[in-house]
């Protein structure tokens, strides 16, 4: 099978996936975040030369979902998209691959990130992320992720991939 025609970022808006799929995807991300004691998740889908956050949860989701574009030549999530390799990274600020674009826009700092490729029909369609953040001027200690947290989001990505496949293959 080949990836569905069109850009993955357009699948929801253009009706390529049914109306239930985004709701189920949102619920799956929220449940996985709860299992790893985190608040912030996002589903980023490919849109040419950038990744678009299509769904998200957490206190800042409404401020960037549908209104931000992550260039594919910057950031850890772009590296995950290009390589197809998941990442569980703590001390994000010290990683030169980290793109501060979204942090600066939201007035936060990202402390830790889990980023996993979303594979649909054998091809990478996007990334799911879970992050620990705090206010940019915070003195509270940073939170971290662990290997089991990466496992949780790899499972979520596999489920989401199958969910999108089933929705894209449905007969109208």
Regions flagged by a language model, labelled:
Residues 119-124, 133, 167:
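Flexible loop/coil segments at beta-strand boundaries within sensory signal-transduction domains
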Residues 1-23, 34, 159, 163-172:
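Signal-transmission linkers at sensory-effector interfaces
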Residues 111-120:
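A short, aliphatic-rich beta-strand micro-motif
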Residues 63-87:
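Acidic/proline- and glycine-rich, intrinsically disordered low-complexity segments
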Residues 139-165:
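Amphipathic alpha-helical "output/dimerization" segments
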Residues 61-63, 90-112, 139-142:
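Signal-transducing coupling segments at domain and membrane junctions
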Residues 30, 42-65, 94, 133:
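GAF sensory/regulatory domain recognition
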Residues 59, 128-144:
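Short beta-strand-to-loop transition segments that serve as allosteric relay/switch motifs
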């Amino acid at each position: 099978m080949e990836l569905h025609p069109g850009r993955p970022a357009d699948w929801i808006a253009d009706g390529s996936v049914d109306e239930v799929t985004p709701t189920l995807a949102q619920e799956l991300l929220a449940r996985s975040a709860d299992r790893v004691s985190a608040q912030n998740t996002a589903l980023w889908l490919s849109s040419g030369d950038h990744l678009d956050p299509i769904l998200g949860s957490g206190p800042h989701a409404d401020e960037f979902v549908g209104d931000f574009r992550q260039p594919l030549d910057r950031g850890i999530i772009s590296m995950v998209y290009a390589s197809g390799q998941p990442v569980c990274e703590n001390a994000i600020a010290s990683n030169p691959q980290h793109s501060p674009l979204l942090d600066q826009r939201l007035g936060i700092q990202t402390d830790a990130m889990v980023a996993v490729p979303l594979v649909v029909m054998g091809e990478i369609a996007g990334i799911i992320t879970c992050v620990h953040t705090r206010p940019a001027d915070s003195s509270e200690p940073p939170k971290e992720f662990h290997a089991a947290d990466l496992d949780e989001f790899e499972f979520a990505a596999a489920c989401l991939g199958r969910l999108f496949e089933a929705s894209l293959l449905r007969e109208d």
